[in-house]
Every structure is written in C-alpha cells, then in structure tokens.
Amino acid sequence: MAKKMIVSVIGAGGKMGTRVTNNLAKHQDTVELNFCETSEAGIAAIKERGFDTVPAETAVPASDIIILAVPDKIIQVVSVGIVEMMTPGSTLVILDPAAAVAKELALRDDCTFVVTHPCHPPIFNDETDMA
C-alpha cells in the first residue's frame, strides 16, 4: 500500500477549516488528516464530528501539506510559527490571497507556498454541497 499523504489543517474547527476537513476526511484511504485547533469552541466542534485534535507542534513537522485556515487578522502571526515548524520540502496552502499580496506571510526557500481562494474553483472537484 502506498504511503498516505499527511495533511494538517491549522484552524480545523473554524468555518473554512471545517469545510476543508469535511472533504479531506472523505479520503482517509490516501490522506492522514491532522486537525489542529486552539480555540475551545473549535476543539469541541471537532470532537462532535468524531475526530481528535493534534497540537500543531506535533503535526506540522510531520506533514507533507499544511493548510492554513485561520482568520485573516491572525494570519501573519500564525504563519510565522507554522513556517518555522515546517519540514523542508513541505507545502503550505493559504486560503487568503490578500495576505500574500500584502506580504503578511512568513516564507522559506526550502518549502512550497500555494495561495488559493475558497470562493474560486474548489480544491476538491467532487463537492456537491456547501458545507
């Protein structure tokens, strides 16, 4: 069996984090999914869906892909901490293209950074509902 891709979603208990993890959870045969969340409400929401949370400090260094699904106002400070923990060759997906234009993201030369927007074509082409 092929090695599963390890994907960690930072902000997994929020609105966008929930949408992303709901879709990724459908592919557990090929994806090992880490739900990273710090808010009590977000952690409770993840547990209600039947999943456990993993601290970012544990999940990020082991991840192939990290998806940053956090509120715009904290993206700069969160990205600094996350990017420091990334393993060379890993990829950070950012759901806020304005943050990249505004140069609010921490970057590294040995990692890949992808910016997408949730209101544009989905990163999951099999979506049939809005949540």
Predicted features, each with a name:
Residues 1-49:
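NAD(P)+-binding Rossmann beta1-loop-alpha1 motif at the extreme N-terminus of oxidoreductases
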Residues 22-25, 48-51, 81-84, 106-109, ...:
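Short, glycine/charged-enriched secondary-structure capping and boundary segments
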